[in-house]
Amino acid sequence: LVGSEMCIRDSYRSAFIITDIDADGNDEALAFYTLSSQSSTQNVRVSVLDKTEDGGWDAMYELAGSGTYVDTVMLADYGSTVDILIGYGSPASEDKSVCIYRYTSGVLASIYEGAYTVIGRWDLDGCGADETVIVRKVGTSVSVSTIKTLDGLDYQTRERNLSVSASYISGCCYGELYDGVNALFIDAVTENATAFTEIVMLDGDTIVSPTSDSSGLLERTARPYGYRTMDYDGDGDVEIPVISPFLGYSALTQSDIENITLWLSYDPELRDFYEEAQSYYNVSGGYIFKLPGRWHNFVTVQRNADTNEITFLKYDYTAQSISEMEGLLSIAVLPTASEQAYENNGYVYIDGTDYVCFMYKSIASESEPLLLTADEVRSNLYYIES
């Protein structure tokens, strides 16, 4: 095959995928390429290759894909059959296209074609097997579809519209909603840059969305875009962030407000959200600091925009300004090259990457009841990958 180098934009990154795609016990290769002599607007080509006895590869089948690049490739192995899901994209279109192929008798045949904004395979009904889940935005309307099969023979397809009106889908997160029940959390952003989260799961043959099915529940998830739904602490439960001004900031203008992040979980009996945790969420700095319980209603913050440093303060309603309040703890995000300089100034390393590190400095007196131990600081700070 003569072609130009390609990159697949998801789990499978190579332009070649070697695996058993027809359940015959032998590996085949899927090759994705474009012809060097053609324009950049041509559709990507997909080729199936079989291994020869001498270790080489022979092209067995070829077709044109439904886009100029491959967005994602997923395989669904049902034992006797394998579904090949290929998502295609094109710079000229907001929509992406998915084709589900089956390779049998030397032919790569399409058994499903559709459009998507986000696609994935997740177990939404707790059956132990993943369903294909398609989230699609058309205009400002958002819908979700599921394609379910346990054997690759009988397929059930379901679709429903969601309540949210969106300019774009900013992300999807899969995880536990409550008591072993998993769901898909869809973050959608409106034209005024407000983010909402829709929750979707399967109950039997029905797509259920607590946020769309209960009046006022979707509105409870409103916050500025950039605050992502996530399992921030790695416990398997997904929480939704909403914000409220820290103590002492309610009378200030919006641009000057420092917000506390309240993490919401869902209670199926109440059919409502409850507050699971409070934190300071530094979106630009890439970290979350969970507030210990004894800090609730007693602490506020002050941010140094020049140094990207946050100082937690003991709230004093009699103080004339935030800056007059007693400091408890400072957290700084800095380039790794500056670590030694901060260490010389009394800061202690908490966490970091190859490029940035997180350090803290305790500035409260030893007798202060709100003073945190080193272990408390470390266990409550979470680095958030972008």
Residue spans for each PLM region:
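Beta-propeller fold detector
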Residues: D58-A64, A109-A115, Q156-S163, S209-S215, ...
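Short, small-residue-biased leader/transition segments that mark boundaries at the very start
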Residues: L1-I8
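Solenoidal tandem-repeat scaffolds enriched in leucines and small polar residues
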Residues: R102-T194, V200
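N-terminal targeting sequences that direct proteins away from the cytosol to non-cytosolic compartments
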Residues: G175-Y178, N192-F196, T206-Y317, T336-S386
